[in-house]
Amino acid sequence: MAAPGEALTQSGYIEHHLSNLSLAKLGMVADETSFWNVHIDSLFFSVLTGMLFLWVFRSVAKKATTGVPGKLQCFVEMVVEFVADNVKETFHGRNPLVAPLALTIFCWVILMNLMDLIPIDFLPYSAAHWLGIPYLKVVPSADVNITMAMALGVFALMIYYSIKVKGLGGFAKELALHPFNHPIMIPFNLLLEVISLLAKPLSLGMRLFGNMFAGEVVFILIAAMLPWYLQWVGALPWAIFHILVILIQAFVFMMLTIVYLSMAHEDPDH
């Protein structure tokens, strides 16, 4: 929310809710376009949700019993089994990192996405009136910096394992001689393969960002256009539908990560 006592127009309300708490807003860097401008709120909530995932799963793992499990242990085991089954079906290489990575991505993205279901004014209003924080966006996955950082991390792993499994020569050969295995077509092959390669992290990060940002904008528009006592009329149906979006986007991000890493482990002569 805005500073206490400050009235906002409808357009001002929307613009305010789409503004991150950044170093530029605090006057610590020159402007919003600076390379060193960090979105503090997105970074904070992404780390917070990541730590929540680690704490819950570590606690369950430490207290796991072979007897009758509790509800939380059953839920965690269900999630782990679901991810493990998808990894077995999709990943055709041998790498002990892939399943834990897929589990981390799936749960972390879900937790970040779930922040979108918190009433739109609750945390920003509380932060403004109790902590004096003028701007607060609480959905990390609605920030392109977060989603693209995750996508680039997956991309870096894909390149690393492509070179490790196939060798630098094998990786270069894959780029230069596919899809047309003829020396004269190398420039054309390189153009196609490099574009295809760079499109992977771009589509991975932008898909998650686009869906979550759109969902956040709908909640903001509902809050801006309706009085507070009627907001639930529009927000509740959208929230129910949005739960499906939250889960699907986490699943898609996880599955594409597994697919990309599986491609990196493929036999170069496949």
UniProtKB/Swiss-Prot annotation:
Keywords: ATP synthesis, Cell inner membrane, Cell membrane, CF(0), Hydrogen ion transport, Ion transport, Membrane, Transmembrane, Transmembrane helix, Transport. GO terms for biological process: proton motive force-driven plasma membrane ATP synthesis. GO terms for cellular component: plasma membrane; proton-transporting ATP synthase complex. One of its GO terms (molecular function) is proton-transporting ATP synthase activity, rotational mechanism. Its main location: membrane. It is a multi-pass membrane protein. It is found in: Cell inner membrane. InterPro entries: ATP_syn_F0_a_bact/chloroplast, ATP_synth_F0_asu, ATP_synth_F0_asu_AS, F0_ATP_A_sf. It holds the Pfam family ATP-synt_A. Disulfide bonds: none annotated. CDD domains: ATP-synt_Fo_a_6 (cd00310). The chain crosses the membrane at residues 37-57, 98-118, 143-163, 217-237, 239-259. Belongs to the ATPase A chain family. HAMAP family: ATP_synth_a_bact. F-type ATPases have 2 components, CF(1) - the catalytic core - and CF(0) - the membrane proton channel. CF(1) has five subunits: alpha(3), beta(3), gamma(1), delta(1), epsilon(1). CF(0) has three main subunits: a(1), b(2) and c(9-12). The alpha and beta chains form an alternating ring which encloses part of the gamma chain. CF(1) is attached to CF(0) by a central stalk formed by the gamma and epsilon chains, while a peripheral stalk is formed by the delta and b chains. NCBIfam families: ATP_synt_6_or_A, PRK05815.1-1. Key component of the proton channel; it plays a direct role in the translocation of protons across the membrane. This is ATP synthase subunit a.
